[in-house]
C-alpha cells in the first residue's frame, strides 16, 4: 500500500528538528500525529474500491494536482522565520502568523507558540530573549482573549518575551518638534532618519515622558528610560534608532569629507557626553538626560537676553554646566571665564548655527562660525539663537587673523578645491621664468652648474608627462591643492619655519615663523604684492662657486629681481632661488636632481643661507639710527612682556633676528623632502629651517 498513500508535497517540510523535548510535551505530539493521520486518509488519490471498478461516492473528493518533487518549477510555500511547536514536531511547514493556519485547523490555536531551537556553541551564554525572531508584519497580536488582554497592558510584558522587547502598539511618540514644525525637516535628513520609524527595534527601550517639570521647561521634552528596560540592559540604555532626537546633530556642520565619518564622530561625542549611560533621575530635577533631545523652539527660553532665573533654577542645572561660570543673567552661557577650555562633547549634537560656549565667548568667533564653510544642505535653525555678525571686524585684532587662525580646519572645506580648479597649472611657463631669473642673477659659471642639474632630470619629466592629457593635468593640480590643504593645517600648528614650493621652485605656502625669520611677508612670497627686495647676497666676499676663467670675467648687466624683468608688471610667486644665496642655490639644485626621481622617501639635511627681505629704503638707513630705534622698541615691549604679557599690542618681528643675520643673510640648518603625485612626478617641496645660533 506504499504506492497508494502519497502525501501532498507542499505539506512536507525540508528540514528536521534538532531539539530535545521533555516528557510533558508528548501529549501535544500525539495530538499532532492523529491530525496528520486524518489528513493522510483524506488525501488518498485512489481508494481500494476503485481498483475493482466500484466508485465510492463517499470517499470521492476533488483530486489535487500532483507535482513532481524534483521539478524545480513546482510551487513552494514560503518558509516561516520560526515554526511553531506543533509544526516543528510534525515536520510540517508553518507560517509567520500566530496561531498558524495548521494549528487553527487542528484546534490547537491556544497552544500555538514558537518552537525552541538548539543553541549554537557560541550562543550558550546569550539569554533566550535575545535570540527571539523579529516579528513580521503578518504577526497577529490578538491570539486569544487572554493574550490580547496581556498585550494591551503596557507595563506587563508578553509571555515568553520578558522585559527585552517593547510592544509595537506602545511605541513612544517623541515631542521633539512642535506642531508648526512638522514636515520641515530637509529630505536628506529624513532619509537618514527613516530607519526604525515604521517598525520597533528589538533593542529599543521604552521612553516615558516625565510629567512633573518646571514652568519654564514646558517646551522641552524630557525622555527618561524606564526601570524595566534599564535593568534589562544592566545599567545603561542602548541607542534607540526610532528616536529621531538621538541623531539630531548637524552632519554637514561637522565638516567631514564623508557621511559615515561624521556619523561616527557624532556618536562618539554623544557617548562621551554621558547621555547614554546616565541613570534615570528624579523628574523634579527638570533637566533631560540627553542634551540632544532638547526641542529648541521660538519661545522666550532661548532668546538673546533671557532672564536667567526664569529658565534655570540653582538646583536644576545639569552636570555639563558645572565646569562653566555662572552667568550674571545676560545669557545662558557666560563668558567671564576665558579658561574653561574646549567645548564640551555635547556641543556636536546641536545644529550648525548653535556654537559652543567657548567659541561664542571669543570676540573673533562671530565671523568664523560654521556658516562660513560651504555646505550642500541648508538646515533650518532658529534665527534668534544665531549670533549677529560684527560689522567692525577690521578694527579689532580679529580682522587681521584669517578664519584658519582661530578655528583651524573647522571652517575649511576641501570640497571647494574640486569645484574651483578647472585649468591645469602651466609648469612650462614656470620653468621658463626660472631659467630667465637664473640667467639674469647668477654668473655664467654658476648658471652652467644649475643648468646641468636641471638638464639631468629634464628627460624624466618629459617621459612622465608626454602621455598625460588635459584632464590628467587638471587632476594633477587638484592633487596638489588637496595636498597643500593638509600641509597648511600642519604649518599652522608647527613652530618650525616652513615653506612649501612647487617643483619649479615657486613658493606655494609659508608659515608665520618663516616670515619672522626672513622678513619676507606672505603676500610677497605668494605674488600678491610686488617684490621690492634688493638683497641678492652679492655684497659679501666672492663665493666659492665663482670662476676665474677669462672668458667669463665680463660682468653681465641684469636686473636686481625678477619683477624688474617683467614688462607687463604682473606679479608672480617668489622662486626659492630668490630666498637663498648663490652657493645655497647651486647646492639645492644638485640635491634636487639627485632626489627628484630617486628615493621617493628620501630627505636632505644641510645648511643654507637665507636672504633677509630688504628694500631700498631699508638699505639707505644708517645702522646707528636703526640700532637706536630698535632699542626703544625693545624697551617698550620688554616692559609689557615682564609685567603685562597679555596686554602687548604689537610685537616687533625683527627683535632677536638682527643678532643672527650677517650681511643680510641668516645661516640656517635645513631639512627638506619631495612629495610626489599619483603619476610619480615631483609635486611639491617641503622645507624646514632652523637658525644656527
Swiss-Prot record:
UniProt-listed Pfam families: PAS_13
Gene Ontology cellular component list: nucleus
Subcellular location: Nucleus
Keyword Transcription regulation found: yes
Region entry Disordered, spans: 1-75, 144-170, 273-299, 350-413, 531-567
Biased composition (Low complexity): 356-367, 394-408
Coiled-coil annotated spans: none
InterPro entries with a match to the protein in the record: ERT1_acuK_gluconeogen_tf, PAS_13, Zn2-C6_fun-type_DNA-bd_sf, Zn2Cys6_DnaBD
Protein's UniProt keywords contain Nucleotide-binding: no
GO molecular function: DNA-binding transcription factor activity, RNA polymerase II-specific; RNA polymerase II transcription regulatory region sequence-specific DNA binding; zinc ion binding
Keyword terms, alphabetized: Activator, DNA-binding, Gluconeogenesis, Metal-binding, Nucleus, Transcription, Transcription regulation, Zinc
Comp. bias regions, Polar residues: 52-62, 144-155, 275-287, 369-379
SMART domains found in the cross-reference section: GAL4
DNA-binding region, residue intervals: 84-112
Main location: nucleus
Described purpose of this protein according to its UniProt entry: Transcription factor which regulates nonfermentable carbon utilization. Activator of gluconeogenetic genes.
UniProt record similarity statement: Belongs to the ERT1/acuK family.
Name of the protein this chain belongs to: Transcription activator of gluconeogenesis BC1G_14637
Organism of derivation: Botryotinia fuckeliana (strain B05.10)
Amino acid at each position: 500500500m506504499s504506492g497508494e498513500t502519497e502525501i501532498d508535497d507542499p505539506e512536507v517540510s525540508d528540514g528536521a528538528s534538532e531539539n530535545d523535548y521533555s516528557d510533558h510535551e508528548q501529549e501535544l505530539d500525539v495530538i499532532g500525529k492523529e491530525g496528520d493521520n486524518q489528513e493522510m486518509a483524506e488525501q488518498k488519490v485512489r481508494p481500494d474500491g476503485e481498483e475493482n471498478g466500484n466508485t465510492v461516492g463517499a470517499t470521492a473528493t476533488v483530486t489535487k494536482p500532483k507535482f513532481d518533487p524534483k521539478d524545480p518549477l513546482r510551487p513552494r510555500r514560503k518558509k516561516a522565520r520560526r515554526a511553531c511547536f506543533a509544526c516543528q514536531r510534525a515536520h510540517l511547514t508553518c507560517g509567520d502568523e500566530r496561531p498558524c493556519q495548521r494549528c487553527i485547523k487542528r484546534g490547537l490555536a491556544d497552544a500555538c507558540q514558537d518552537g525552541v531551537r538548539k543553541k549554537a556553541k557560541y550562543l550558550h551564554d546569550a539569554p533566550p530573549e535575545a535570540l527571539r525572531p523579529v516579528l513580521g508584519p503578518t504577526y497577529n497580536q490578538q491570539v486569544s482573549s487572554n493574550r490580547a488582554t496581556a498585550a494591551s497592558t503596557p507595563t506587563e510584558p508578553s509571555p515568553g518575551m520578558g522585559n527585552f522587547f517593547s510592544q509595537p502598539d506602545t511605541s513612544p511618540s517623541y515631542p521633539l518638534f512642535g506642531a508648526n514644525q512638522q514636515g520641515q525637516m530637509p529630505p536628506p535628513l529624513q532619509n537618514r532618519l527613516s530607519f526604525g520609524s515604521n517598525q520597533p527595534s528589538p533593542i529599543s527601550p521604552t521612553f516615558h515622558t516625565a510629567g512633573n517639570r518646571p514652568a519654564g521647561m514646558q517646551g522641552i521634552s524630557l525622555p527618561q528610560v524606564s526601570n524595566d528596560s534599564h535593568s534589562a540592559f544592566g545599567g545603561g540604555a542602548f541607542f534607540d534608532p526610532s528616536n529621531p532626537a538621538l541623531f539630531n546633530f548637524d552632519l554637514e556642520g561637522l565638516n567631514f569629507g564623508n557621511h559615515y565619518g561624521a556619523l561616527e564622530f557624532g556618536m562618539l561625542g554623544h557617548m562621551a557626553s554621558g547621555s547614554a549611560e546616565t541613570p534615570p533621575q528624579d523628574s523634579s530635577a527638570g533637566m533631560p538626560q540627553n542634551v540632544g533631545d532638547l526641542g529648541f523652539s521660538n519661545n522666550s527660553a532661548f532668546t538673546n537676553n533671557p532672564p536667567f532665573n526664569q529658565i534655570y533654577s540653582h538646583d536644576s542645572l545639569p552636570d555639563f554646566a558645572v565646569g562653566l561660570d555662572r552667568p550674571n543673567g545676560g545669557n545662558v552661557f557666560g563668558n567671564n571665564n576665558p579658561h574653561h577650555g574646549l567645548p564640551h562633547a555635547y556641543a556636536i549634537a546641536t545644529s550648525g548655527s548653535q556654537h559652543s560656549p567657548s567659541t561664542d565667548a571669543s570676540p573673533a568667533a562671530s565671523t568664523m562660525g560654521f556658516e562660513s564653510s560651504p555646505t550642500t544642505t541648508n538646515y533650518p535653525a532658529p534665527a534668534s539663537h544665531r549670533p549677529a555678525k560684527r560689522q567692525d571686524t577690521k578694527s579689532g585684532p580679529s580682522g587681521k587673523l584669517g578664519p584658519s587662525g582661530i578655528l583651524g580646519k573647522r571652517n575649511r572645506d576641501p570640497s571647494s578645491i574640486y569645484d574651483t580648479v578647472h585649468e591645469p597649472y602651466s609648469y612650462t611657463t614656470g620653468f621658463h621664468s626660472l631659467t630667465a631669473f637664473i640667467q639674469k642673477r647668477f654668473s655664467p659659471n654658476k648658471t652652467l652648474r644649475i643648468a646641468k642639474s636641471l638638464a639631468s632630470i629634464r628627460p624624466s619629466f618629459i617621459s612622465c608627462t608626454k602621455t598625460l592629457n588635459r584632464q590628467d593635468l587638471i587632476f594633477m593640480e587638484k592633487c596638489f591643492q588637496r595636498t597643500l590643504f593638509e600641509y597648511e593645517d600642519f604649518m599652522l600648528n608647527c613652530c618650525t619655519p616652513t615653506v612649501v614650493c612647487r617643483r619649479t621652485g615657486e613658493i606655494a605656502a609659508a608659515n608665520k615663523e618663516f616670515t619672522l625669520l626672513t622678513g619676507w611677508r606672505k603676500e610677497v612670497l605668494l605674488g600678491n604684492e610686488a617684490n621690492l627686495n634688493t638683497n641678492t647676497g652679492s655684497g659679501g666676499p666672492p663665493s666659492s662657486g665663482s670662476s676665474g676663467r677669462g672668458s667669463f670675467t665680463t660682468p653681465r648687466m641684469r636686473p636686481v629681481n625678477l619683477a624688474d624683468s617683467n614688462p607687463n608688471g604682473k606679479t608672480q610667486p617668489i622662486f626659492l632661488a630668490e630666498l637663498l644665496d648663490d652657493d645655497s642655490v647651486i647646492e639645492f639644485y644638485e640635491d634636487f636632481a639627485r632626489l627628484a626621481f630617486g628615493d621617493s622617501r628620501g630627505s636632505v639635511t644641510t645648511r643654507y643661507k637665507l636672504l633677509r627681505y630688504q628694500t631700498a629704503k631699508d638699505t639707505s638707513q644708517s645702522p646707528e639710527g636703526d640700532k637706536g630705534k630698535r632699542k626703544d622698541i625693545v624697551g617698550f615691549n620688554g616692559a609689557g612682556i615682564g609685567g603685562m604679557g597679555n596686554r602687548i599690542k604689537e610685537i616687533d618681528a625683527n627683535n632677536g633676528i638682527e643678532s643672527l643675520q650677517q650681511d643680510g643673510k641668516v645661516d640656517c640648518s635645513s631639512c627638506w623632502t619631495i612629495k610626489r603625485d599619483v603619476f610619480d612626478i615631483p609635486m611639491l617641496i617641503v622645507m624646514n629651517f632652523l637658525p644656527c645660533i
